[in-house]
Every structure is written in C-alpha cells, then in structure tokens.
Amino acid sequence: MTTATGTKPKKMEAFKMERGVKYRDAAKTSVIQVRNIDPDQELLPKPSWMKIKLPAASAKIDSIKHGMRRHGLHSVCEEASCPNLHECFNHGTATFMIMGAICTRRCPFCDVAHGKPLPLDPEEPRKVAETVQDMKLKYVVITSVDRDDLADRGAAHFAATVREIKALNPECKVEILVPDFRGRVEQAVEILKQNPPDVFNHNLENVPRLYREVRPGADYKWSLELLKIFKQEFPNIPTKSGLMVGLGETNEEILEVMQDLRDHGVTMLTIGQYLQPSRHHLKVERYVPPEEFDMFRSEAERMGFEHAACGPFVRSSYHADLQAKGELVK
C-alpha cells in the first residue's frame, strides 16, 4: 500500500484518488473545504504540562507491533499518531483498527489517511481474535475507519469481530468504538445486537457549532441518536463518548454537550486536549490547563456520569480497561 503526502493539486476537480492509496497531510487536506487550515501558520507553543518524555523502545512495544504486522492488522495508536502509544504499548494494550487504514472521511483534526479503501478482508475478524489470544489480552478496544462506501457502513464487520474475539477468548472484555454509520443508526444497532460488546463507545469529538469544520460529513444529532438507541436496546451495557478541547469551543459549550450525552443515556466520558498532527491539520486554538479538566470531571460527576476520564493526554481508549473498572484516569 502506498502513501501520498504530496503537494496540493492545482485544480481540485482534476484530482483523482487511486484506490488503496493513503492520502495524508497536504494531499488529504487539499480536498477539505475548511478555510482555517494554513500550512504556514505559527504553531502555538506547548505549555509545560503538555511536555512529556517518551519512554525508550522496549520488548513489549516491539512484541505488539510484531503481532499486528504478522496478521496484517492496524492499530489506531499508530495510524492516528496517538501521543500515548509508547505508554499503552508498554502497558500491553492496543486499540485495533479494523476495515483497513484508509478512511472515507477527511476530518481535518485526524491523522488517519483518507482515500478510496480496499475491499474488506473477510478473515480480519478471525485474525484479530487470534492476535488477542496471542497477546493474552483481557480487555481490547476495537475501532475502525469510516467506511461510507459499504452498504451497512461496516456494522456487520464489527459484529463479526466481536463474535470471533469472544469465541476464542471467552474471558476477554470487548469495547467497540464505532463511527456514526452515516446516520443509519437503527440498521447498525440491529446488526450490532447480534454480538453485543461489553462497552459501546462513539465519540462526539467536539461541539455542534464547530461540526462543519471539525467533522465534515458528520451530524451531531446522528451521533446522539446512535448512543441513545443502543442504550435503549441494551440498558445494562455502558455507553461512552469522548470529546477534544482546544479547537475554539468554550467551556460552556463543552458542558452543554456533556449534558446532551447524559440526556441520551451515556454513562462514561473522556475529555482530552486536541493536538495538531501536522501543519496541514486544524490548529490548536488553546491549551486547556489541568485545573479546567478537573472542573470537567467534577461537573461530569455532578451530572451523573458513572466514570469520567478528563486530562490533557486522555484519549477515548486511553487505559480503557481501567476506565471500565471505574478507576481514576487523567
């Protein structure tokens, strides 16, 4: 599979994507109608609380990467350039990204490649299950790229992956972090309920005012409806959602989204700082200080969330096993 990071096409209408090619950076954002991406922008300096020392390479990190490569699998940790990769891999956890590494959406905050994806690998659910067994994992997170090219948007592939993991690893807990299925939420839940997960996660990402810029192709109401319908179908399965801050939203808007999530039955919450993957992505408007994350967590508890992980480096699947146990993550 090749990667394209080239210069911006002269004319967008003349730009033809090739199937199976991963378009990143300038090649990806050149086809996004967002006006505030300036590759020559001055980057906001990172404050002291955002500076971390990455651990050295370890046998555990190499083992997880080898396990992924051996089965031709992908981790969102690597594909999305997560800042917690070394910590999580050293901890022996990884988030599997199914249905390939090419997304049909082109969200300008995300470092996952855009393009025309290849057909699904029907053996992938089994490969994921075998990798989970090889790694002796007790808790796994399964996420995916958006697959708007598929009739069911990938719901059946999620269900098959959960089924295969549970069949081979009956003691393993499975959390799925799903896309919005392009609004076909009732159809998706009907498929997913054949093999329900232990935790159902779908990220709202940010506030509705900024959706056109942050999540082109998504719809705030679709996402809330997906979370609501799944919770109605499975009232005893925790539902979870994540938000990024630092994109130009206000704290008041974040609190309103948190209340919307509670009103739709969501019981678990993650809030973390947005980090700009490259100059060809949305810029960081501000770095939210730790005390404001503490405020979000306090407000989440007041609203009735059963668990809220809020902190600069928190991501949706960051220490997901500890989140599911109700332990403090920040």
Swiss-Prot record:
Catalytic activity field: [[Fe-S] cluster scaffold protein carrying a second [4Fe-4S](2+) cluster] + N(6)-octanoyl-L-lysyl-[protein] + 2 oxidized [2Fe-2S]-[ferredoxin] + 2 S-adenosyl-L-methionine + 4 H(+) = [[Fe-S] cluster scaffold protein] + N(6)-[(R)-dihydrolipoyl]-L-lysyl-[protein] + 4 Fe(3+) + 2 hydrogen sulfide + 2 5'-deoxyadenosine + 2 L-methionine + 2 reduced [2Fe-2S]-[ferredoxin]
Residue positions binding [4Fe-4S] cluster 1: 77, 82, 88, 317
Subcellular compartments: Cytoplasm
Positions annotated to bind [4Fe-4S] cluster 2: 103, 107, 110
Taxonomic placement: Bacteria, Pseudomonadati, Pseudomonadota, Gammaproteobacteria, Pasteurellales
Limits of the Radical SAM core domain: 89-306
EC number, as in UniProt: 2.8.1.8
Lineage: superkingdom: Bacteria
Cofactor binding summary note: Binds 2 [4Fe-4S] clusters per subunit. One cluster is coordinated with 3 cysteines and an exchangeable S-adenosyl-L-methionine.
Stored SMART domains: Elp3
Record-level Gene Ontology MF annotations: 4 iron, 4 sulfur cluster binding; lipoate synthase activity; metal ion binding
Cofactor(s) named in the record: [4Fe-4S] cluster
Family listed: Belongs to the radical SAM superfamily. Lipoyl synthase family.
Pathways involved: Protein modification; protein lipoylation via endogenous pathway; protein N(6)-(lipoyl)lysine from octanoyl-[acyl-carrier-protein]: step 2/2
Name this protein carries in UniProt: Lipoyl synthase
Any Pfam family the entry gives: Radical_SAM
Keyword entries, A-Z: 4Fe-4S, Cytoplasm, Iron, Iron-sulfur, Metal-binding, S-adenosyl-L-methionine, Transferase
